[in-house]
Amino acid sequence: MKYKDLRDFIKILEHRGDLKRIKFPINPDLEITEIADRTIKSGGPALFFENPTGYTIPVLCNLFGTPNRIALGMGKESILSLRDVGKLLAFLREPELPTGVHDFFSKIPHFRHILHMPIKRVSTAPCQENVWCNQDVDITHMPIMRCWPQDVSPVITWGITITRGLKSKRQNLGIYRQQVLSKNKIIMRWLSHRGGALDFQEWHKNTSERRFPITVALGADPATLIGAVVPIPDTLSEYAFSGLLRGCRTEVIKCISCDLDVPANSEIVLEGYLERDETAIEGPFGDHTGYYNTTAKFPVCTITHITQRNNPIYLSTYTGRPPDEPAILGMAMNEMFIPIIQKQFPEITDFYLPPEGCSYRLAIVTIKKQYIGHAKRIIFGIWSFLKQFMYTKFIIVCDDDINARDWNDVVWAITTRMEPDRDTIIVKNTPIDYLDFSSPISGLGSKIGMDATNKWPGETEREWGIPIKMHDTVRHYIDSIWDKLDI
């Protein structure tokens, strides 16, 4: 299903009974977070706050609060169908020419998707129906949420930040937290390996210009929002990938103040720049770990223009102890990772990032084991294959008779198939998320890999145990009479 903009998606959710309009006045300061947190933990609907206290712009929250809503935003009906998106990503990472007639026809769907990749530039757009500039710029008219009691200020959470490297034609889209400093200044909090930060670093090193153009789009269509968080190949534009997801080209319009393109149907757009050496202390804020993060210096963005639709909608979210919206998005990303990983490691049968592991800090992998030491190869392979897993602290590898998504199964494998000294790998002084305060040094820490597979001759000198399993004939017979037993 194609959604031209966020409003199209809202209509579909409302039609399905998956969006709740709240007319009661609710304060963006803490109160929306409490309602959203309770709702997401119960698997509830998207929330449309029509009357945020003190503001005239409504707030949309919990948009992607369930896996099925994420799938719907990608034009799919269930989270399992997101593996098709992963297969497309795997193809785009390493495209292969057809090897014969049958292979040619099997690849036609992939090539057909490519027709939707080029952006479509328009000359007028809803996102520029209203324009404020210079002294008239004031972001405090937006109902920006303060999410947790010790948060230092309101914070923009769902803005798509758009940048371009000095030597790059490709524009980068990313989601970064932005602390509000004043009516026209926000802090751009991005990790050093993320696309926007890399673009800024390249510009900083290779030019003497004072100002780095940057834009934040709020309330884009679902495909563009999801495209900004999916781990696509570095050579592919998020706009191009959004077109693939949507099934039609992404409409963009040139910013008023610079040459960057923004989604034409965004609700609100903040145009501005980063000064070469202007930074500020960011935080603390409650984060996806369930803790307040430490403070650090990040670049300051000066907003020169605000453009917005008539009667705009402010899209927002919060981060906290899982499950939160980023954790649910992580579950969906998990399904897309699987075909990408399997293309590199075909022996992997499942790959699971439990949401309670804060999205990426713990991975459980099941494999068809083929040789001694196989699990250790998989552990090192995952740490090095995709940059998304450079911060994964724990990797547990099990055989394919274990359900990676069932802790009962995984714990049984760990406690019966692992010998701590032989079957663990600890690597020290490796990159770690700087938000991880458990590491002894910010940004540098250790990782552990666990081999919870059955051990083969050469890995153990002992006779290995045989798992207990009932005869299939007995199980099938009992299945056939189970209802009659009325147990």
Swiss-Prot record:
Name of the top EC class for this enzyme: lyase
EC id: 4.1.1.98
Catalytic activity of the protein: a 4-hydroxy-3-(all-trans-polyprenyl)benzoate + H(+) = a 2-(all-trans-polyprenyl)phenol + CO2
GO annotation, biological process: ubiquinone biosynthetic process
Cofactor(s) listed in the protein's UniProt record: prenylated FMN; Mn(2+)
Protein localization: Cell membrane
Domain of life of the organism encoding this protein: Bacteria
Molecular functions per Gene Ontology: 3-octaprenyl-4-hydroxybenzoate carboxy-lyase activity; metal ion binding
Coiled coil: none
Residues that coordinate or bind prenylated FMN: I175, Y176, R177, R189, W190, L191, R194, G195
Record pathway: Cofactor biosynthesis; ubiquinone biosynthesis
Residue sites binding Mn(2+) per the record: N172, E238
Keyword annotations from UniProtKB, A to Z: Cell membrane, Decarboxylase, Flavoprotein, FMN, Lyase, Manganese, Membrane, Metal-binding, Ubiquinone biosynthesis
The keyword Isomerase belongs to this UniProt entry's keyword annotation: no
Assembly with partners or alone: Homohexamer.
Function: Catalyzes the decarboxylation of 3-octaprenyl-4-hydroxy benzoate to 2-octaprenylphenol, an intermediate step in ubiquinone biosynthesis.
Protein name: 3-octaprenyl-4-hydroxybenzoate carboxy-lyase
